[in-house]
């Protein structure tokens, strides 16, 4: 059985998709089988990771939207490969916004993904990572949280609004656990876009220590030109420059993630 993690934050631009891509890639490099489910209609994660996004996703009609349009199809039927042999993708497209409106009219709008997550898929992967959009009302966030074991809050140290939005996400998670029966645990928050010796970054880190009662990770992801260049080239930082300092940051964060999960998961093979 796989371990499912949903990345959350109500604010855009905090590095949620970048984290999904690079942590997923680093886990794959460590010989874990990983599936990333891209639930953001911007499809940045899908375009970055997919071997040939236009051919394999758009032309072949293998996206989450196409899966949800069908009545008898499952995750396994729509998974596409990435450039890493251990990392697969359930891709997004610009149509996902319209799909979100569509599933609101279903009799069970919050379990559309759960109903299509097949046993074959769960048994194949060690990790399933859900990359979510920033909108608090998005049904895909509810869908992801319901079938996840953990949620992981991503915070940008250059944007105080990411912290101000936390109570809204806390309410979403409370609703999902109390009203929808989800059993989900927090992972210590990850701070991204960190600038050393920067007053705002220092302030945000100190605020995070107070606000997140389940803690923050020791690892931080620094804000670097190389990270921005790798994103512009539609590559993970490990492909663009695996020796970069920010690549080391993501490696530390991934290792810390595994240690955290080891403490709570008996089924994780380490």
Which residues does each PLM region occupy?
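P-loop NTP-binding core
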Residues: 1-270
